[in-house]
Amino acid sequence: MGNTVIIAVCTVAIEVVFGCMAAYAFARNRSRLNSFMQSFCLGIMMIPPLSILVGVYTELVALGGINQQWAVIVIAAAFGLPMSIHLYTNFINSIPVALDEAAAIDGAGVLRTFWSIVLPQLKPVTVSVIILKGV
């Protein structure tokens, strides 16, 4: 029970932190590279995990990650991160850009805008990600 809780909490924390930051970059920056990266994330979601299991196992053996908690956490987070990014990106797209512009006019940088304006509004989707990934 203890190992499962540690793995679940660490995996969900990684997915929430990196997912919301990556999604903010995807949602607010419009470029060809961002649309390619979004398509790449969606493409990763379509690959069945069992199809790359042999390659992942080979790399874990080379890295000494067999029977290690960190290996399970990294693999679980890597497989779950595209879905978290997708959920966060769609939610951030519904937040008006005018809020970011108003924060910029008030002198807030990108990190301050994300931390003070966008992140508090991400509570509903964060709860959804925690429920979907933590169960």
Range-by-range predicted roles:
Residues 1-135:
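A structural signal for multi-pass alpha-helical bundles of membrane permease subunits
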